[in-house]
């Protein structure tokens, strides 16, 4: 770590982090995630040192993989911020390949000479014969200043980790890890993933100006792995004392000659006391800033998931550190599809039909907390609808003069409104249509429900509160800023947007007038891990925003 005082008072650190959270949230209203990376068959990488920025103001000396000078990668998906692949980043570049293709990864060791050899380990991938490099304990290595080339045929689809296979207790801790995503071959994509409901969901996105940022229509070669949106999260922790000692020893051995006495590092990696807990190389709130944000030149990837009701959201998760992290997704369970590219199928000989495509049924568990095991990757589907709320999430009101408040809900065979993909209540749970939640609402929503909301003057709104119990800016504006005929405490006629109990101020991360989504915290269930250097909030924490269709999820950030 750079020469900074690690012994700041808790009070000073708390004030600093609180200020950082506030400033970051002001700029994260439209910062989303997707699963950005570089795609191709040839990747020229380097391992090099740099500093990682942390929310408490620290810059931590680290090592990471990056793109070699002169290598021009193909960035996917196309984002409004130009993709950046510096010579060092944490996590390393997400390598995106297609099943069955021949892949070549060349690694040049630009670490300090005293750091010794380095390498890349691709667990579960069969490598071809080596023509360069130095044999190591687990894989072929690159000596300081030298190069090693890894060749393999891209295996079955799915998400996998890659990381250093050399002195892993130090090199992985220092940041030498990344993700390998294998996409299904185009001919292997199940037909139902490009037709039927999959097509309707794309129509729903297009009707509101959204673009398809998926890497593929399916996660695996299986008809029950279709998805509508995707995110990649790599979990790791960092003990700054190890990094500080590594930097000090590198400085002390600067200019040494490979193989000479004393030209090596002897950094203790135990006892282990991490202070930073990272999602995609960043701690909260930094993880909610955009991908490729210039303030994080060596931490390009964010963690800021969004979705619409009814979408199948693929989450790709990798445990990259030394510890196991219980990743808790509020809002619903995650259906595990596979681990390390191995689809979990039923042992039964029976088959099911998925929109006319027969296949062996999946057997992955449903988990409300998905454990991220060191070195292990999994793919899972997160799904959310308003079913089970027991009130109309869109605040429909049959007596309203607003046409969006009187939309119809025609149930399909599963009870959802899927007939018109252009409607803002596409995928509404029709059983709760027009069902009120508030007993005596002020605004233009149905009344005579079971709930009296607390007085807005008696509590403070959280940064992610959408402004009302309803989904979307139309419903929230009606609920908080309108008086209409038939409401128990208002005059006759319709007066919308003139007065109201709110929309509330202060909800800067989920503005009531433009987004008004339902926010679900996604975080480590080891509560210490949602801190930054022991200060809450921070660490492994992000928010999943479920947004109404009227809100455009613009993942070009």
Which residues does each predicted region cover?
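Copper-binding active sites and cupredoxin-like electron-transfer domains
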Residues: 2-10, 17, 24-25, 29-557
């Amino acid at each position: 770590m750079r020469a900074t005082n690690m012994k700041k008072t808790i009070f000073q650190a708390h004030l600093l982090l609180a200020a950082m959270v506030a400033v970051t949230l002001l700029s994260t209203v439209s910062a989303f995630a997707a699963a950005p990376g570089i795609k191709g068959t040839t990747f020229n990488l380097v391992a090099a040192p740099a500093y990682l920025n942390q929310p408490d103001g620290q810059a931590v000396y680290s090592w990471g993989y990056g793109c070699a000078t002169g290598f021009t990668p193909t960035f996917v998906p196309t984002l409004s911020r130009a993709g950046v692949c510096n010579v060092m980043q944490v996590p390393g570049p997400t390598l995106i390949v297609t099943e069955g293709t021949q892949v070549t990864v060349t690694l040049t060791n630009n670490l300090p000479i005293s750091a010794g050899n380095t390498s890349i380990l691709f667990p579960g991938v069969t490598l071809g014969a080596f023509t360069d490099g130095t044999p190591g304990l687990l894989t072929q290595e690159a000596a300081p200043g030298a190069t090693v080339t890894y060749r393999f045929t891209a295996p079955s689809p799915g998400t996998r980790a890659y990381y250093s296979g050399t002195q892993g207790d130090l090199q992985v801790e220092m940041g030498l890890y990344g993700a390998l995503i294998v996409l299904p071959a185009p001919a292997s994509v199940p037909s139902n993933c490009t037709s039927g409901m999959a097509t309707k969901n794309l129509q729903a996105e297009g009707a509101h100006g959204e673009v398809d940022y998926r890497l593929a229509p399916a996660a695996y070669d299986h008809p029950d792995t279709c998805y509508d949106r995707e995110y990649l999260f790599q979990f790791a922790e960092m003990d700054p004392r190890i990094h500080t000692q590594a930097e000090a020893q590198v400085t002390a051995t600067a200019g040494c000659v490979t193989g000479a006495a004393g030209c090596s590092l002897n950094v203790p990696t135990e006892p282990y006391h991490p202070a930073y807990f990272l999602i995609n190389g960043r701690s909260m709130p930094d993880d909610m800033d955009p991908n490729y944000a210039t303030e994080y030149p060596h931490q390009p990837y964010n963690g800021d998931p969004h979705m619409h009701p009814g979408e199948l959201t693929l989450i790709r998760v990798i445990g990259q550190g030394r510890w196991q992290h219980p990743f808790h997704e509020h809002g619903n369970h995650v259906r595990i599809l596979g681990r390390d590219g191995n689809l979990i199928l039923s042992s039964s000989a029976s088959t099911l039909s998925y929109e006319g495509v027969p296949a062996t049924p999946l057997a992955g568990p449903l988990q409300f907390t998905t454990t991220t095991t060191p070195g292990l990757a999994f793919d899972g589907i997160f799904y959310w609808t308003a079913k089970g709320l027991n009130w109309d999430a869109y605040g429909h009101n049959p007596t309203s003069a607003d046409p969006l408040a009187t939309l119809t809900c025609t149930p399909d065979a599963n009870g959802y409104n899927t007939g018109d993909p252009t409607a803002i209540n596409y995928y509404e749970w029709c059983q709760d249509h027009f069902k009120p939640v508030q007993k005596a609402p002020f605004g233009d929503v149905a009344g005579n429900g079971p709930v009296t909301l607390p007085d807005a003057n008696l509590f403070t709104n959280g940064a992610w509160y959408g402004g009302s119990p309803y989904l979307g800016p139309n419903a929230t504006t009606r609920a908080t800023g309108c008086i209409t005929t038939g409401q128990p405490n208002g005059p006759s006629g319709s007066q919308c947007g003139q007065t109201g109990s709110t929309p509330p101020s202060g909800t800067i991360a989920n503005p009531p007038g433009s987004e008004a989504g339902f926010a679900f915290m996604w975080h480590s269930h080891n509560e210490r891990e949602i801190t930054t250097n022991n200060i809450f909030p921070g660490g492994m924490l992000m928010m999943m925003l479920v947004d109404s269709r009227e809100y455009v999820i613009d993942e070009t950030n």
